[in-house]
Amino acid sequence: MSYNGIGLKTAKGSSTSGHIQRSLADNQAGNVKNFSSRKEESQGRVARASRERKLDGSMAAHADRREIEVRVSELRDELEDADIDAEEIERRCEQLRRQLQSEAAERARVAQAYTPRNARSAGAT
């Protein structure tokens, strides 16, 4: 009832027939001659996936806009708890929103103008 030390000593009470099958999960691991090509292929897939995620700026822009709205919402909650007039709350929230949007635009402008050293050296090789 066991194969290479794997399996049950007896199938009794296990609700199984006790039949042991060869694991198909390690099919590629046993094929040593193609190991290096498989490794290169998998590394290429990981590199392509990370490049594709970096290229999608719409997700980053959405996350930035969402962060701004979360901070505005937190301010609104604090001001409402302090029993401040609704017009004053709107004014302060809009002021914070404009400030955060201008800071985000400045960060984006600086990020676009500046290329990190490791990116410059990677592009040269």
From Swiss-Prot:
Residues 37-60 have a biased composition (Basic and acidic residues). Keywords: Coiled coil, Cytoplasm, mRNA processing, mRNA splicing, Nucleus, Spliceosome. InterPro entries: CWC21, mRNA_splic_Cwf21_dom. It is found in: Cytoplasm; Nucleus. Residues 62-103 form the CWF21 domain. Belongs to the CWC21 family. Associates with the NTC complex (or PRP19-associated complex). The NTC complex associates with the spliceosome after the release of the U1 and U4 snRNAs and forms the CWC spliceosome subcomplex reminiscent of a late-stage spliceosome. This is Pre-mRNA-splicing factor CWC21. It comes from Eremothecium gossypii (strain ATCC 10895 / CBS 109.51 / FGSC 9923 / NRRL Y-1056) (Yeast). The gene is CWC21.
